[in-house]
A protein has these predicted regions:
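Phosphate-handling catalytic cores of nucleic-acid transaction enzymes
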Residues: 1-428
Length: 428
């Protein structure tokens, strides 16, 4: 899990400025759900022409005692303005509830107050309460930070199992509808569009177990994952900087830019970058022949692009040249985490033949000598747990893309990723 790019977008640089180096990559991912939650009815158009809002969900998976709390303080600072407004509205709601209960069964009860936008929700909120908060949020995002991923189970509701996973999937999908119909007059009957950004932390073991039943159903591909590398035994304790008024003051203009944005925002540079990164992922999928990687990369690219859009808006709708390297890093890191934590389990779930390996995907071309035979290509595929039948198509793609050249019926020569380090241009 590589360290951050040298030159960071100013907002990210600020948000990790008080964080010890070992935690910086995790914080750089984990700040996005709360940043995105400041956008209200702001839409961006992806390269498939579908409009998205900044739906960002983040899970930090790291060992016990790794310092998962490192994300808390930056998020507290980002959420400060939303919490202030929530506080006022929670007070209004409390006053109304007290008034209603004190009046007993009298008829002159005041209606529930208007405009009760309360964005930050309790981690253990029930399903009906979630639907009601969503309806009252008037197009704003709900947000929560879970100290442990299984706190999500409160959202299961009494109905079918796995409703919390359905909520995760729907939150990511534009134009979703979710709700419940109840008969009782006091019950919540609402259909809402879920706008829900969240952060959760968990140990690697618990995280794997939590998602083990839904490996192929979509939540994993819609969530952004990050981690903290294991510390050396006996290493010095990381020391944090101080979050002071100067930090808040520097953060303020970015938050204000997010809050005042509206409507469909066009960011041509983010659009171009999404196209470029999609191609880069497709290239790696062709070379590693990993279907799991390819499938995960589609939504990972949407997540990375949404982060680019959030940075763009926070920066006053100005693109900065540091964005590209950061977003590329962010995408590669997200995919590396997904492959490391879930790759082989997803493969097993998809393939009953049980052939798998626990490493992430590898570039098969790199594993072959500079000149190789058809049989060697078959062998490399099988060593990596892939079938022999796909060899012909793989070689055809490599030749078509200019990675390799066919010399005879059975012999091939590498043009790229050669052991001698010299790339050859096939047009020469």
């Amino acid at each position: 899990h590589s360290s951050l790019p040298k030159r960071l977008p100013a907002l990210i640089k600020l948000l990790v400025s008080r964080t010890p180096d070992v935690y910086k990559p995790a914080v750089a991912h984990a700040v996005f759900p709360s940043l995105g939650a400041h956008l209200h009815r702001v839409r961006f158009k992806y390269i498939d022409n579908v409009e998205h809002e900044a739906t960002l969900m983040n899970v930090l998976m790291a060992g016990t005692g790794a310092g998962k709390d490192c994300i808390s303080e930056p998020i507290n600072r980002i959420m400060a303005d939303i919490r202030r407004r929530d506080e006022d509205n929670l007070r209004r709601e409390r006053e109304w509830k007290n008034e209603v209960t004190s009046k007993g069964a009298n008829k002159d009860k005041r209606q529930r107050p208007e405009g009760l936008i309360i964005q930050e929700i309790d981690a253990d909120m029930t399903n009906p309460a979630f639907v009601m908060r969503m309806a009252e949020a008037d197009g704003h995002f709900l947000y929560t930070k879970l100290n442990e991923i299984d706190q999500f189970d409160a959202l299961k509701g009494t109905g079918r199992a796995g409703q919390q996973f359905q909520i995760m999937c729907l939150a990511f999908d534009p134009g979703n509808r979710y709700g419940q119909t109840r008969v009782g007059a006091q019950s919540v009957t609402e259909k809402v569009t879920i706008r829900f950004n969240w952060n959760a932390a968990t140990t690697i073991q618990k995280g794997r177990r939590y998602f083990s039943k839904v490996l192929t159903d979509g939540p994993i591909s819609r969530i952004n994952f990050c981690t903290i590398p294991e510390r050396e035994i006996g290493a010095d304790m990381p020391v944090y900087g101080t979050y002071d008024a100067a930090f808040d003051e520097e953060l303020r203009p970015y938050i204000e830019n997010l809050v005042k944005a509206q409507g469909l925002i066009d960011c041509p540079q983010a659009y171009k970058l999404a196209q470029k990164l999609k191609e880069e992922c497709a290239d790696f999928a062709r070379l590693s022949q990993s279907r799991v990687y390819e499938n995960l990369s589609f939504r990972a690219n949407v997540i990375a692009w949404l982060k680019a859009c959030v940075l763009y808006v926070a920066n006053g709708c100005q693109w900065d040249k540091t964005f590209e390297d950061f977003i590329r890093w962010s995408l590669q890191y997200d995919l590396a985490c997904k492959m490391e934590f879930f790759g082989s389990a997803i493969e097993e779930a998809q393939a009953a033949d049980g052939l798998h390996n626990t490493r992430g995907p590898r570039n098969l071309l790199e594993l072959l000598p500079d000149e190789f035979t058809y049989q060697q290509a078959v062998l490399v595929r099988q060593q990596e747990g892939k079938n022999a039948e796909g060899t012909k198509n793989m070689l055809w793609q490599w030749i078509h893309r200019g990675y390799a050249l066919q010399l005879t019926v059975d012999n091939y020569k590498k043009l790229k990723f050669r052991k001698d380090g010299n790339d050859i241009d096939k047009n020469r």
